[in-house]
């Protein structure tokens, strides 16, 4: 299966007051062109679709046009999750209706069971697990509400312990988080993450054949 892994589009971002609308249009055009040229089966957007939780009308139109070009014009599926800059509720509005099309899948808020979307190619099923941005408290309330000290790694460990993943199949995790061993880039890390508190241990991803992450603003390869 061929898919394009991207993230952190940050549609609507201003750079020191400078409007990046034209730059955004150029990048989104490139995304569509590459997906079409490479004959991608789907495009994975691993969080931070928008730069602000309340996106402007212009930003919403840009994203709608991107989906229209990929899904409707070219039949390329899109799988998306919310990042920390997105409003999960807004991003996933009408998601049940959109899923009926079989072309667009989006998850806005973390739940006890990670959303699984299964696509098929000539070799069989590929399972995409869509995990939007979460804080330790988001997961703590599901499994360990009484625990006082709870990190991102603890939260991810407990979340994975409650998933049923068939490791004999091909599995892809889509998430918006920091993995241990990343190189800090841009503004998407704080002091806690520098100290390693916000990092997920690499061995937590052992059930997945590929992990499509967002949150870091340059391309990196971590793990096997």
Model-derived segments and spans:
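Extended recognition/assembly regions associated with phosphoester-bond processing machinery
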Residues: 1-45, 49-224
């Amino acid at each position: 299966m061929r898919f394009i892994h991207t993230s952190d589009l940050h549609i609507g971002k201003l750079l020191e007051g400078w409007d990046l609308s034209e730059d955004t249009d150029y990048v989104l055009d490139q995304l569509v062109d590459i997906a079409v040229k490479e004959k991608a089966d789907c495009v994975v957007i691993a969080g931070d679709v928008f730069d602000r939780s309340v996106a402007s009308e212009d930003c919403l139109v840009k994203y709608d046009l991107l989906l229209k070009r990929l899904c409707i014009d070219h039949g390329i599926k899109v799988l998306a999750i919310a990042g920390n800059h997105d409003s999960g509720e807004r991003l996933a509005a009408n998601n049940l209706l959109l899923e009926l099309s079989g072309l667009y899948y989006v998850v806005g808020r973390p739940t006890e069971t990670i959303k699984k979307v299964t696509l098929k190619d000539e070799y069989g099923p590929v399972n995409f697990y869509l995990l939007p941005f979460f804080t330790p408290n988001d997961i703590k309330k599901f499994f360990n509400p009484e625990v006082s000290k709870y990190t991102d790694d603890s939260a991810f460990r407990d979340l994975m312990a409650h998933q049923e993943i068939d490791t004999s199949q091909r599995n892809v995790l889509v998430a918006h988080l920091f993995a241990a061993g990343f190189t800090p880039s841009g503004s998407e890390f704080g002091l806690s993450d520098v100290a390693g508190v916000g990092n997920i241990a690499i061995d937590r991803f052992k059930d997945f054949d590929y992990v499509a992450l967002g949150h870091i603003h340059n391309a990196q390869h971590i793990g096997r």
